[in-house]
């Protein structure tokens, strides 16, 4: 069973919280979003979410490490990213998407990690916060 994230409901609660702040006169001057680092959203060219966003605790990544290692060895992957192997890392989640729904990757224009997606919903700006991006085993620090 997939662990589906309910972004519409979660974002509605963020907006409700901001409205409550306004009602009581406590207007935040800044806001940060923090979630588990490896989960992501794929957006198409019109910024629509492709498929369901599935949380890292799902079992769909089982065996995806072996699929990734057909393209790059674990040793080389670690040398490039400096991130330890965890079966739930973004790289293995993306391989699971490639195997089950390759059309999502074909249509995707943007990958945003979950905190960056919430920032996008709040601001309309697509950004990729560096330390967040490194957690997924996709970024080379060099």
Predicted features by range, described:
Residues 1-52, 62-63, 79, 107:
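N-terminal glycine/serine-rich phosphate-binding loop of ATP-dependent small-molecule kinases
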Residues 16, 20-23, 67, 96-100, ...:
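Residue-level signal for well-ordered alpha-helical scaffold segments within enzymatic catalytic domains
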Residues 44, 65-75, 126-127:
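Glycine-rich phosphate-binding segment of PLP-dependent enzymes
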Residues 52, 64, 68, 121:
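Residues that scaffold the ATP/ADP-binding catalytic core of kinase and kinase-like folds
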Residues 54-55, 132:
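Residue-level structural signal for beta-strand termini and adjacent loop
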Residues 58:
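Carbohydrate-associated surface elements
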Residues 63-67, 138-141:
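Short, charged, surface-exposed secondary-structure boundary motifs
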Residues 77-142:
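Gly/Ser/Thr-rich active-site cleft segment
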């Amino acid at each position: 069973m997939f662990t589906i994230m309910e972004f519409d409901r979660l974002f509605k609660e963020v907006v409700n919280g901001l409205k409550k702040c306004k009602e009581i006169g406590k207007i935040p001057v800044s806001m940060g979003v923090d979630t588990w680092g490896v989960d992501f959203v794929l957006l198409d060219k019109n910024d629509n979410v492709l498929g369901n966003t599935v949380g890292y605790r799902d079992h769909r990544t089982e065996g995806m490490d072996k699929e990734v290692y057909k393209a790059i060895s674990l040793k080389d992957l670690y040398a490039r990213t400096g991130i330890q192997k965890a079966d739930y890392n973004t790289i293995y989640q993306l391989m699971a998407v490639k195997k089950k729904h390759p059309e999502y990757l074909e249509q995707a224009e943007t990958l945003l990690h979950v905190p960056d997606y919430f920032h996008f919903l709040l601001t309309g700006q697509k950004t990729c916060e560096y330390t967040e991006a490194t957690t997924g085993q996709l970024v080379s620090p060099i």
